[in-house]
Amino acid sequence: ISCSLVGSEMCIRDSSFTYGDNNFMLYFYIALCVILLLFIIMTFYLIIIRQMTVQKFYIPVALFLGLIFQCLVTVHGVPDEPTHFDAAYSLSNKMLFVKNTETPGNTIYKRRCDAQLSDMLSNGLETNSYYQLLFHSFEFASDTDLIEISYVSTSGLVPAVVYVPAAIGLSIGRLLHLSPMLTFQLARICSLVVFILLVYFAICIAPFGKNLLGALGLLPITLQQAASASYDSVINGFIFLFTALCFYRLHNPKRKKSYLIALGFLALFIAIVKGGVYLPLLLLLLMCFSHVPHPHMHKKMRWIVPLCICVGAVLLIAVTLIKFMPMFSAMFATDISADPENTIYPISYVFQHPLQTIYILWNTIIQCSDTILRGLLGGKLSWLDININWSLLIVFLIILLLLVNVKGDTPVFTRKSRTFIAFSCLGSLLLIMFSMMVGYTTMDCDHIQGIQGRYFLPLAPALFSLFSTSMVSVDHNRSCKIWETMMVIESLVVVQAITMII
């Protein structure tokens, strides 16, 4: 077999076949359009004819649309997915009792065929990825010998639980000796299913904002991340569920042990992911537990809940600091004297130059706010190189603002509750920006680099709930029409994306 590079396409030839063109992509495009037509028919039946609520139609719609996005944005088509696959593969080795490598450093055992496919696929979307998906998925693995490869560990940033769904999919594929492409796709399907179930539970638990949660769980960027090996599927799902539980506790002060245990677990999870940037969301706990106490509660007992909250907050902050201390120490120790123009901003710079830091934050908001909003609504797919038309994204934004005001599902907050929600979102937003400033941005830049809209998805349920207003009221019939409009726009996003690829 000889390999030659012609333009940007790889041509592989042997005595029996030749491929190097993308003519098969035309058939893929036609098939995708037919599938989208079936999707529109299904949603029209469920939403318009049957008049189903979001609790009833979310799972089939999210699963159907998620699988479409999984085929559209193929393996390695999501930012940093190769790293996520390796982390999930490491966990899969433990599930299958594969011994650790004896080489010092970050190395793992991997099936030779899986390693070869990983090396073959590029980061992003290109015709070879679709060729492998269409013609080499339903095969058995040809070479399952384990070889040692190096990988980048993410254990310092997230707990292993975020890779459990993908690791289960990888383990199933390896046990059944499935092809590398199908094995990777199984990992992505497991991640998608777990995310859909988490959002479904959030929708069922939330006393209000069910339509908002469902719409956020169907945004293109949300489904792209959910239908991949990225840890975003579990992180977004857990924080959506956490927000729903907080709203439930605010609306229904009666204690339910299972919900309290879930809140405790999710609060701990939030404290130990992504450097603690979502830690301010724990203010939602303070909001729901600082509710007016029961009138028959003894006065001394009324102090127990606030005291427990304060102690818990201190413990969670301590856990965050301990978990990420090596990373924080490295950021503090950055030497800016050697080459300040090519050195990343250290944490000490933020404290030593507060006015300059505020200036950088302001510049970031002015220069990058449209890009961030575009990314949040799903306008920058794959490795940020699939740009969706703004006209479609504006419709998504209008739909979110309307669905948060559906009659009987509109969030009702006191001024105190709105203040808690606003400060929790603002705090997380600032921490995300600061983390990218001291972890990615070089000192020759006057704005923060690397911020993506998907980083703010966990804040979206709480943030968009603040836009509930008595000036807008959407009845059920109109909400069904709004939902069907969203399904049509989702289909148009897929069509635009695939036309940009072929």
Segments and roles (model prediction):
Residues 228-235:
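Short acidic/glycine- and proline-prone juxtamembrane loop motifs at membrane-interface regions
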Residues 245-255, 278-313:
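Perimembrane helix-loop-helix junctions
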Residues 95-186:
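Interfacial juxtamembrane loops and adjacent helix segments
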Residues 53, 178-181, 200-220:
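Transmembrane-helix signature of polytopic, membrane-embedded enzymes
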Residues 25, 141, 318-407:
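Membrane-lumen/periplasm interface segments of multi-pass, membrane-embedded glycan/lipid transferases
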Residues 40-44, 182-208:
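Transmembrane-helix motifs of polytopic, lipid-linked glycan transferases
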Residues 1-12:
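Single conserved hydrophobic/aromatic residue that forms the stacking wall/gate
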Residues 224, 259-275, 280-286:
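Membrane-interface alpha helices of multi-pass inner-membrane proteins
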